[in-house]
């Protein structure tokens, strides 16, 4: 199924907007849509603010027309139509708590997107519920999922969220610091075979208890697993990374802040690979591993 989906391209004749909701609790709340350029690409879009007003055409990520004042407190549906190469909240304290719901991705030409720090965002809509508005095909041109849902409060991840994103290479901090995430679905990264970095991908997911043993099996081009599961102290199983032979760094991949962690099983003998990848503190404090005593000092 993943291979089939990688071959599916967005129908350029279809135009669907990017839609999300914000909730304000005070009068005259100012909200700035977090537009960014990407690799020389600039926006060309309009914004319907959900209060009866619409912006003029915006052709710059720094345009003042991306800023809006909501006179009354309430919940507003913001609709972005046109071309938007980048939407990155980046933990912006002025807007992160205001975003409460992702309604649809639409098809707007996204290359990078993140809701980093949106701690009132608890779910990603399933692809079936979006079938009439582009599904997940609007993520088909995304190259970077860095900090994608970092610091949100997701309780689950749709297994097919990346199935239409064959060009994506960057998955650093993608689901980092999600304190409400307990499991990861099988096949999550199967379609992103060109991915090169999963650095800190699940860093600090302190409630995460298990991940599929095959999670990264298709990611043969990955070179960086630095800190991927760092401080995931409830995690019980350790991956072997058998198919990931191009990796140059596993530094801090399972680094735990203390020995009070649940990790068990046998550590992969990464230090025996040739060439030897960087493994600084890769298994620090992972004393529950059956071969912990034989792990070289520079890997723990």
Map each language-model feature to its residues.
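Intrinsic disorder/low-complexity signature
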Residues: 8, 202, 216, 234, ...
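N-terminal capping/linker segments that flank leucine-rich repeat
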Residues: 1-143, 159-166, 191, 218, ...
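Tandem repeat domain/solenoid detector
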Residues: 152-160, 164-169, 173, 177-196, ...
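Hydrophobic face of beta-strands forming the core of extended beta-sheets/solenoids
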Residues: 124, 133, 145, 157, ...
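Consensus positions within tandem repeat domains that build extended binding/scaffold surfaces
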Residues: 113-116, 143-150, 170-176, 197-203, ...
